[in-house]
Amino acid sequence: MQLSLLKAKIHRATVSHSELNYEGSIAIDGLLLEAAGLYEFEKVHIWNVTNGARFTTYAIRAEHGSGIISVNGGAARYVQVGDLVIVAAFAQMSEDEAAVFSPNLVYVDAANAMTHTNHSIPTQVA
C-alpha cells in the first residue's frame, strides 16, 4: 500500500506579492525552498490561514534570501498581500518508508525570514 504523507511545510508565511497577470505558480524565497526540500515546479498545496481558501499550484524559485512569497496567476484571486499561508507538499511512500520518514518543517517570521526548522510536530494536548 502507498501512503501520502506530509513531505514539507513552510508554516505561516506572509504573502509579499500577488501577481494576477504573471504565469501561474507561487514564487518562494530560494532559501525557504531549499530548507523545505521543495523542488521548482513541484505541486504544492496553499492553505490561506487568513481567509480559509485552499488551492494547489506549483512552486518556482524567488531570489535567495528575499523573503518573497508571491502567489501568481489565477491563484492570486485567493490571497491578498499580507495574508498568512501554509505551503505544503506531500510524498507517496510505502508503509516501511513511512515508518522512518520525517517531514521538513520550516518556520518563518512576519518578514518570511526562517526562524527555525523541525522534523516533527508536537503532540496536541487538551
From Swiss-Prot:
GO biological process terms on file: alanine biosynthetic process; pantothenate biosynthetic process
Chain segments annotated as transmembrane: none
Primary residence: cytoplasm
Subcellular location(s) per record: Cytoplasm
Organism domain of life: Bacteria
Pfam families (UniProt xref): Asp_decarbox (PF02261)
PANTHER family per the UniProt record, alphabetical: ASPARTATE 1-DECARBOXYLASE
Protein name: Aspartate 1-decarboxylase
